[in-house]
Amino acid sequence: MDPYKYRPSSAYNAPFYTTNGGAPVSNNISSLTIGERGPVLLEDYHLIEKVANFTRERIPERVVHARGISAKGFFEVTHDISNLTCADFLRAPGVQTPVIVRFSTVVHERASPETMRDIRGFAVKFYTREGNFDLVGNNTPVFFIRDGIQFPDVVHALKPNPKTNIQEYWRILDYMSHLPESLLTWCWMFDDVGIPQDYRHMEGFGVHTYTLIAKSGKVLFVKFHWKPTCGIKNLTDEEAKVVGGANHSHATKDLHDAIASGNYPEWKLFIQTMDPADEDKFDFDPLDVTKIWPEDILPLQPVGRLVLNRTIDNFFNETEQLAFNPGLVVPGIYYSDDKLLQCRIFAYGDTQRHRLGPNYLQLPVNAPKCAHHNNHHEGFMNFMHRDEEINYYPSKFDPVRCAEKVPTPTNSYTGIRTKCVIKKENNFKQAGDRYRSWAPDRQDRFVKRWVEILSEPRLTHEIRGIWISYWSQADRSLGQKLASRLNVRPSI
């Protein structure tokens, strides 16, 4: 018998119950005892194995994006951008690439309602012919912080109080009162789009600035945007309470039901590009993840479409064990010097090794679908079949070679080692622009939400004043409305 034929898969299920080792089990409802009412015997191997397996079913929860659901489909290029990038999966219109997408909430735990006011994750894994490309984004184009060293703190502030295990806005507002750069993200999170109706009716963004490299070697900064073809729909605060009270998995069910009925969710992919030579022409730093790029100056360019036409086969295997990492890029797409992106390149791989083990990229849902080869051997839960005798490089006995050099940005740097804040902060302009772009009733809902959280009893007069000052600098009328309703004078 070929021992590799019956690899772990439900496709090879026996017609009868067995142990993990394959031995037949004749009774799966009674423990082995001495007599009818005697003590249970330790020699009941099946009992011990069954219970031990059960008590180890849960793996560490994601520290963020714990609540999520995945679906599979394809990405198809619809517009030629081969002049902008040499990425193989973007080489020509009509090219299709298999994908898996994970949608999630960010802050709350694995079993939390999907109606919480929170950022949503929008992560896409492209299984390309040149390896996996993970575009790990959100439904907001910006984030609260611009430097990865602050990431543990912002998550700690957003997460529940470590003493009470209750999420409390006095903690969040205390921490972020030190971060005026967070204002633009609040203009998404506390706007109407802060509670999407479901995952099908929300936008997605790559958030960070990446780089595209053309065959000629020309480099462009790029931002990625996903636009749902069925439009954007949100829940009001009142609707969210009703929907979440009736079904805490409403968005998961909506996604599953839509795909099962043939109503496949679809998004269009657009990009914005910028010549690095032009980065000093703006009143903000293009690598600052707390800022958006103005679309009137850097217009959206269509690239392709994302279609989800298959539900997952198993939640644990294809959602819980699905692992994303912004460090996974392919030739033609590279990182930028965005400080938060640089940190995520390490942090995401590190958290997956903690959750799933050092060989998490061998799991079927994470493994590349193209041929691959390296000498990363052994480690916990390594199940890759290998029969090589050479596990080092170079060798006269192994003909493997390094691949041809792929194009990457050739930046040159000068300067001293330093820890500093970027010079072009400009923390208030874009937040004010977004607020003023809304209709009056939408502005009123935003103000109402801020009045509510700024009324937290444990929030100090000083912190309230700081926030009113921030919003006043973004838009004078907004600050005045908050000050009037809270009976607080702004202070800096």
UniProtKB/Swiss-Prot annotation:
Query: rRNA processing among the record's keywords?
Result: no
Query: Catalytic positions?
Result: 65, 138
Iron as a keyword of this entry, yes or no, is yes
UniProt function note? Occurs in almost all aerobically respiring organisms and serves to protect cells from the toxic effects of hydrogen peroxide.
One short Pfam name that applies is Catalase-rel
Species assigned in the record? Arabidopsis thaliana (Mouse-ear cress)
What UniProt keywords are attached to this protein's entry? Answer: Heme, Hydrogen peroxide, Iron, Metal-binding, Oxidoreductase, Peroxidase, Peroxisome
Location in or out of the cell:
Peroxisome
What is the similarity comment for this entry? Belongs to the catalase family.
Q: Which Gene Ontology cellular component terms are annotated?
A: apoplast; chloroplast; chloroplast envelope; chloroplast stroma; cytosol; cytosolic ribosome; mitochondrion; nucleus
Q: What induces it?
A: Induced by cadmium.
What EC number(s) does its UniProt record assign?
Answer: 1.11.1.6
Subunit comment: Homotetramer and heterotetramer. At least six or seven isozymes are produced from a mixture of 3 gene products. Interacts with NCA1. Interacts with LSD1.
Q: Which cofactor does it need?
A: heme
Return one GO MF term.
Answer: catalase activity
Residues reported to bind heme: 348
Catalysed transformations (reactions):
2 H2O2 = O2 + 2 H2O
One GO term of the biological process aspect: response to light stimulus
Entry-linked InterPro entries? Catalase, Catalase_clade1/3, Catalase_core, Catalase_haem_BS, Catalase_immune_responsive, Catalase_sf
Query: Where does it primarily localize?
Result: other
This protein is called Catalase-3
The record's SMART domains line, in alphabetical order, gives: Catalase
Top enzyme class of this protein?
oxidoreductase
